[in-house]
């Protein structure tokens, strides 16, 4: 049941070619408008020009994972701790390496006029704060996706028990609620990565 078959990969690649290889057409126009609106939503920083691109890329990858897993296997991979932890660790590591390579890192670690004890204690606090971020990102995304899934399924089951199972719109409503949760959680995760990059 949880196996990936050749036809699944073939269909995924087949659909991807329509998204990325069309030079002109309605689908290409819609994708461009969607991407431009995402760059507007994530804003643009003069100090770190690629931060919005990284956030938009993270948002699109998370949405693809959420929708791809949900509509093919009825389970979102972002609800699995393993997938979310690896993705959060990679995203956090990119923000950490960007921060370390900047000039702010040396100024941030030793401020002029501070005593050695204060610098050491602040360094320990900052290290704990920095290394707890991937765990916080993992827990936040996994728990919110799972809670959103459980709430929408409980609402669906409750409405189905009270109204009967002849209403198709109840299942459509539950699917739309799940999709809304996917959008919100992907946005929050990518926005946090954007904020980590702009520190």
From Swiss-Prot:
State what changing residue 66 to W does. In strain: VT847
Entry's Gene3D superfamilies? ATP synthase, F0 complex, subunit A (1.20.120.220)
Cytoplasm listed as a keyword: no
InterPro entries attached to this UniProt entry? ATP_synth_F0_asu, ATP_synth_F0_asu_AS, ATP_synth_F0_asu_bact/mt, F0_ATP_A_sf
Q: What is the effect of changing residue 86 to F?
A: In strain: ED3032 and ED3036
**Membrane topology summary:** Multi-pass membrane protein
Q: What is the effect of changing residue 98 to A?
A: In strain: EG4181
Share what the entry says about its subunit structure, partners included: F-type ATPases have 2 components, CF(1) - the catalytic core - and CF(0) - the membrane proton channel. CF(1) has five subunits: alpha(3), beta(3), gamma(1), delta(1), epsilon(1). CF(0) has three main subunits: a, b and c.
Q: What is this protein called?
A: ATP synthase subunit a
Q: State the organism of origin.
A: Caenorhabditis briggsae
């Amino acid at each position: 049941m949880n196996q990936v078959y050749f036809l699944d990969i073939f269909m995924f690649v087949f659909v991807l070619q329509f998204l990325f290889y069309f030079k002109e057409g309605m689908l290409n126009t819609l994708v461009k408008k969607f991407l431009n609106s995402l760059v507007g939503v994530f804003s643009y920083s003069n100090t770190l020009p690629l931060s919005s691109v990284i956030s938009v890329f993270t948002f699109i990858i998370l949405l693809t994972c959420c929708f791809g897993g949900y509509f093919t296997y009825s389970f979102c991979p972002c609800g699995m701790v393993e997938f979310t932890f690896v993705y959060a660790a990679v995203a956090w590591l990119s923000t950490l390496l960007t921060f370390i390579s900047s000039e702010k890192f040396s100024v941030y670690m030793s401020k002029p006029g501070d005593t050695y004890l204060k610098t050491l204690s602040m360094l320990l606090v900052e290290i704990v704060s920095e290394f707890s971020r991937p765990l916080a990102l993992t827990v936040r995304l996994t728990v919110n996706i799972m809670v959103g899934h459980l709430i929408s399924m409980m609402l669906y089951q409750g409405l189905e028990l009270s109204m009967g199972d002849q209403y198709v719109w109840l299942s459509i409503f539950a699917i739309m609620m799940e999709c809304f949760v996917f959008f919100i959680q992907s946005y929050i995760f990518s926005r946090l990565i954007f904020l980590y990059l702009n520190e």
